[in-house]
UniProtKB/Swiss-Prot annotation:
Any one of the GO BP annotations: brassinosteroid mediated signaling pathway
Assembly, per entry: Homodimer.
Provenance organism: Arabidopsis thaliana (Mouse-ear cress)
Residues of the bHLH domain: 43-92
Family note: Belongs to the bHLH protein family.
Residue stretches of biased makeup (Polar residues): 13-23
GO MF entries: protein homodimerization activity; transcription coregulator activity
Residue ranges of the region described as Disordered: 1-58
Cited function: Atypical bHLH transcription factor that acts as a negative regulator of a variety of shade avoidance syndrome (SAS) responses, including seedling elongation and photosynthetic pigment accumulation. Acts as a direct transcriptional repressor of two auxin-responsive genes, SAUR15 and SAUR68. May function in integrating shade and hormone transcriptional networks in response to light and auxin changes.
Domain of life: Eukaryota
Protein name: Transcription factor PAR1
Misc note: Plants overexpressing PAR1 are dwarf with compact rosettes and inflorescences, epinastic leaves, shorter flowering stems and siliques and a general dark-green phenotype. Plants silencing PAR1 exhibit a slight increase in the length of hypocotyls, cotyledons and primary leaves.
Keyword Transcription regulation on entry: yes
């Protein structure tokens, strides 16, 4: 049984059985490659989605940690929590500077007492 194939100039030519098998084989190979590429793409999309979910979980964990650390943080939304965190950090830095100044002052007093036999 002979098959025909349309050519670009719209004429028909006969295909031998071996040529027909080659065309079918190529089509099957194309279909396998297409399925494999689609499968790889789906796997990549799945991996991207999983990575995004993991990142989102990490962010949620960090926000929860901030809510535990910042006084009153549990009652705040994310935006207010970040603002409160910034203020809290500035407050802590100010306290550290104050403690350093007081420590330095007290050390000088102790040194002066030692000079005068105190």
């Amino acid at each position: 049984m002979e098959e025909t194939l349309a050519t670009p100039d719209a004429t028909r030519r006969s295909l031998s059985p071996s040529c027909s098998a080659t065309v079918k084989s190529r089509a099957a190979g194309f279909e396998r490659r297409t399925k494999r590429r689609l499968s790889e793409t789906n796997a990549s999309v799945r991996e991207d989605r999983e990575e995004a979910e993991e990142e989102e979980d990490e962010v949620k964990e960090k926000i929860e940690a901030l809510q535990r650390i910042i006084p009153g943080g549990a009652a705040l939304g994310v935006d207010a929590l970040f603002e409160e965190t910034a203020g809290y950090i500035l407050s802590l830095q100010c306290q550290i500077k104050t403690i350093k100044v007081l420590t330095s002052f007290l050390q000088r007093i102790d040194q002066e007492d030692m000079k005068f036999g105190g």
